[in-house]
Regions:
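Fe(II)/2-oxoglutarate oxygenase catalytic core
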Residues: 1-83, 89-117
Length: 117
């Protein structure tokens, strides 16, 4: 149900070409990366959904994107049921989780190289 809502509202009804889940806890690292090659910069889209029931701000795990010159472009805190939509060719990463966090950071991602929305 969530996937269909995301597909219709943020992907113009286009089929996803990738769907994946990431699980992160204290001690896990996430490197900066792009979901799709830069050649899709005009059309790629990724949506990251956080299906967590509870998340404290001080637990970390923030989602961060970088500009083309490597500076922080945007940052979003993890919040229950939050959806972050961005250009899938943009460099991004999840920041580390605090040692005070005993929860699992869950992120479900939906992506498509060509979105006509």
């Amino acid at each position: 149900e969530v996937a269909e809502i995301v597909r219709q509202k943020h992907f113009g009804g286009e089929a996803f070409t990738r769907v994946w889940a990431n699980f992160q806890s204290f001690g896990d690292e996430s490197a900066f990366h792009r979901d799709f090659p830069v050649k899709y910069a005009q059309s790629a889209r990724t949506a990251v959904w956080y299906p967590v029931m509870n998340w404290e701000r001080d637990w970390g795990g923030d989602f961060i994107t970088l500009s083309e010159d490597g500076e922080v472009d945007a940052c979003a805190l993890v919040k229950p049921n939050r959806l972050v939509v961005f250009n899938g060719t943009q460099t991004h990463a999840a920041r580390p989780i605090s040692r005070y966090c005993s929860e699992l950071r869950i992120a479900v991602s939906f992506g498509c190289e060509v979105v006509n929305a």
